[in-house]
């Protein structure tokens, strides 16, 4: 596996020197300063590459080239946004970058309710509390029809939760959900958020799939011609929220994507933490079934709670993900590719570390503090080395 590290650009509290000291050789980054829908120019791409090269690092994966909301809703200037996306892909390929992660989640990117969930050892994790989210939907956002998504017991719990909230609690929960987490290119006020949700009135799961299919038919041929690997990221959490459809949450969704545009350039970012939230997702089977289409991996573990729709981020080798089995499957695919003549390792990054040690005293990007990810990368590296020394000696020699 290629050991990579997500970096949010010059304003990231974690420096490129820190990244190099962590032992990563590749960087996963994006041009966050370019507005959604605009073309990434060769000049801007080369500028970022030069920043990385000066520190002895390479730009391994783009995460992400954001998909404009008008593409998802097929409104406004969506065809122009697609044309701009195509040109950005060509420009990235011209600059030697061959793997692009993206997602097709409506309105919100990844979603959490608590960014400072205290763990027993004193470190902090990210958490999605289903009842807190229900309190937001039912009593703060007051979304029409939201009660249909919750049982009577959950509605009662949400009402109790809301009654106990202070004004600061309400502001914090609202901000955590709609203000934009790291990697999200857009944040909203409450009124803007209601307006965004309204844009999806009449767009159900089938319709959003149609829109994704149209997008894929437009961009996959460009990726094929340019030698780019596209890697769609799963929904996080992997189910419908806020009445919005989600189209990349299960093995059936993965199968649909492959069948819709059957090309090796139309592939997946296999995020174990996102897919792993669902108890019905067999991660190893999903990975092995679509191994030849997995172009990028996010390795992290989540811990489902008493309410199975609630979860928090676990340590990388703990929680509900069998990380040893996952890495074993990744290495098996790497060996298969190597025997077929493709010696490129599959890029992997340690996803979402705990905030711990000295980072507890610092301002950090939620989920992306340095020390927690350093710990995760070291643990994942150890599993990889152990498997290479015992089961995949051909890769060790390679």
From Swiss-Prot:
UniProt-annotated stretches for the region Disordered: 342-362
Molecular function in Gene Ontology: ferrous iron binding; manganese ion binding; mannonate dehydratase activity
EC number: 4.2.1.8
Coiled coil regions in record: none
Cofactor(s) demanded: Fe(2+); Mn(2+)
Keywords per UniProt: Iron, Lyase, Manganese
InterPro entries: Man_deHydtase, Xyl_isomerase-like_sf
GO terms (BP aspect): D-glucuronate catabolic process
Entry-linked Pfam families: UxuA (PF03786)
NCBIfam families (alphabetical): PRK03906.1, uxuA
Protein name according to UniProt: Mannonate dehydratase
Organism encoding this protein: Pectobacterium atrosepticum (strain SCRI 1043 / ATCC BAA-672)
């Amino acid at each position: 596996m290629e050991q990579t590290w997500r970096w949010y650009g010059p304003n990231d509290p974690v420096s490129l020197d820190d990244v190099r000291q962590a032992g990563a050789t590749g960087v996963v980054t994006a041009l966050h300063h370019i507005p959604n829908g605009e073309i990434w120019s060769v000049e801007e791409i080369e500028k970022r590459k030069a920043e990385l090269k000066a520190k002895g690092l390479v730009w391994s994966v783009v995460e992400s080239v954001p998909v404009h909301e008008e593409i998802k809703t097929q409104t406004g200037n969506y065809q122009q946004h697609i044309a701009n996306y195509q040109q950005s892909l060509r420009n990235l390929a011209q600059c030697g970058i061959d793997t692009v992660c993206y997602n097709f989640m409506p309105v919100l990117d990844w979603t959490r309710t608590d960014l400072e969930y205290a763990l027993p050892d004193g470190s902090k994790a990210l958490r999605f509390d289903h009842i807190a989210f229900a309190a937001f939907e039912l009593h703060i956002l007051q979304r029409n029809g939201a009660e249909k998504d919750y049982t009577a017991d959950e509605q009662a719990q949400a009402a109790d939760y809301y009654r106990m909230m202070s004004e600061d609690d309400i502001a914090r929960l609202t901000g955590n959900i709609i203000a934009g987490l790291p990697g999200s290119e857009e944040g909203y006020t409450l009124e803007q958020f209601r307006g965004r949700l309204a844009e999806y009135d009449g767009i159900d799961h089938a319709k959003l799939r149609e829109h994704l299919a149209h997008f894929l038919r437009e961009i996959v041929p460009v990726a094929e011609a340019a030698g780019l690997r596209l890697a769609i990221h799963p929904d996080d959490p992997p189910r419908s929220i806020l009445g919005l459809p989600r189209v990349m949450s299960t093995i059936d969704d993965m199968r649909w994507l492959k069948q819709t545009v059957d090309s090796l350039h139309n592939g997946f970012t296999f995020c174990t933490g996102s897919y792993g939230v669902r108890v019905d997702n067999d991660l190893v089977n999903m990975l092995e079934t679509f191994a030849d289409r997995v172009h990028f991996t996010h390795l992290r573990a989540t811990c489902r709670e008493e309410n199975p729709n609630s979860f928090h981020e676990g340590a990388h080798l703990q929680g509900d993900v069998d990380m040893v089995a996952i890495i074993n499957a990744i290495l098996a695919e790497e060996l298969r590719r190597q025997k077929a003549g493709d010696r490129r390792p599959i890029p992997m990054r340690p996803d979402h570390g705990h905030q711990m040690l000295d980072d507890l005293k610092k301002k950090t990007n939620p989920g992306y503090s340095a020390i927690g990810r350093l710990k995760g990368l070291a643990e994942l590296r150890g599993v990889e080395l152990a498997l290479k020394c015992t089961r995949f000696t051909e890769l060790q020699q390679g």
